[in-house]
């Protein structure tokens, strides 16, 4: 299953700079 990068799903996906929260956190 290919899903778009989601910030806060505890997974560092391609193109993401965060992996466990919002960029503000």
Curated annotation (Swiss-Prot):
Entry superkingdom: Eukaryota
Entry keywords, A to Z: Calcium, Cell adhesion impairing toxin, Disulfide bond, Hemostasis impairing toxin, Hydrolase, Metal-binding, Platelet aggregation activating toxin, Secreted, Toxin, Zinc
Cellular compartments per GO CC: extracellular region
Keyword Hydrolase on entry: yes
Alphabetical list of InterPro entries matching this protein: Disintegrin_dom_sf
Enzyme class: hydrolase
Keyword field contains Transmembrane: no
Localization, UniProt: Secreted
Ligand binding (Ca(2+)): 6, 9, 11, 13, 16, 19
Disintegrin domain ranges (all copies): 4-25
The protein's required cofactors: Zn(2+)
Listed GO MF terms: hydrolase activity; metal ion binding; toxin activity
GO BP annotations listed: venom-mediated suppression of platelet aggregation
E.C. number: 3.4.24.-
Additional record remark: There are two distinct forms of the vWF-dependent platelet coagglutinin. The dimeric form (snaclec) is 34-fold more active than the metalloprotease botrocetin in promoting vWF binding to platelets.
UniProt family annotation: Belongs to the venom metalloproteinase (M12B) family. P-III subfamily. P-IIIb sub-subfamily.
Subunit structure, as described in the record: Monomer. Botrocetin and vWF form a soluble complex.
Protein name, entry field: Zinc metalloproteinase-disintegrin-like botrocetin
